[in-house]
Amino acid sequence: MDITIQHPWFKRALGPLIPSRLFDQFFGEGLLEYDLLPLFSSTISPYYRQSLFRSVLESGISEVRSDRDKFTIMLDVKHFSPEDLSVKIIDDFVEIHGKHSERQDDHGYISREFHRRYRLPANVDQSAITCSLSSDGMLTFSGPKVPSNMDPSHSERPIPVSREEKPTSAPSS
C-alpha cells in the first residue's frame, strides 16, 4: 500500500475549506483553533494536529472478536446511559442504537444518536447472549458459540443492557 507523505505547506487547494472535525464523534463538544482556521493554524505550527490525534484515541471505535468459543463486541458509548441504548438481535444481526435527547453541556446544547449493525456468526447461541455497560462507558456484547452440529434459533429479541460499576480494561490486540 502506497502512502503519500505531503508537507503541510503543500496541501491541496480546497484543504482549508473542508472541515476536519465537524462531522465526527466529537460533534458538539467545542471546536479547536485548527477546526475553524485550518490554514492559519497549520502555518503557525504545521505539525500540530491535536484534533487528529484525539480522534484516533477517543473515536468510539468498536472492537469485534470472534474467538473459538465466544463472540464479543466492545463499543465505546460513554455519552449514553443504559436507558439511552437499545440492543436487539434481528435474525443474524446485532443492532445497537443509542439516542439521547437534547441536553446542556459545557458548550451549549447537544443531542446524539448512532446506529451500529454487526453480523452474528451462525454458531452463536442467541439465547445466552449478554450485554453490559461498564462505568467507563464500554458496552460489551457477548455470546458463547455452540458446536456446529447444533442449529441456533433465529428471531428478533431485545437484549437488556446492565450497568457495571467497574471500568472495562482496555482491549488488548
Curated annotation (Swiss-Prot):
SUPFAM superfamilies: HSP20-like chaperones. PROSITE patterns: SHSP. The keyword Electron transport does not apply. Keywords: Acetylation, Cytoplasm, Eye lens protein, Glycoprotein, Metal-binding, Nucleus, Zinc. It is found in: Cytoplasm; Nucleus. Belongs to the small heat shock protein (HSP20) family. One of its GO terms (cellular component) is extracellular exosome. GO terms for molecular function: identical protein binding; metal ion binding; structural constituent of eye lens; unfolded protein binding. Zn(2+) 1 binds at residues 100, 102. The modification N-acetylmethionine is found at residue 1. It holds the Pfam family HSP20. Residues 153-167 have a biased composition (Basic and acidic residues). It comes from Gallus gallus. Zn(2+) 3 binds at residue 154. Signal peptide: none annotated. This is Alpha-crystallin A chain. Contributes to the transparency and refractive index of the lens. May act as a chaperone, preventing aggregation of various proteins under a wide range of stress conditions.
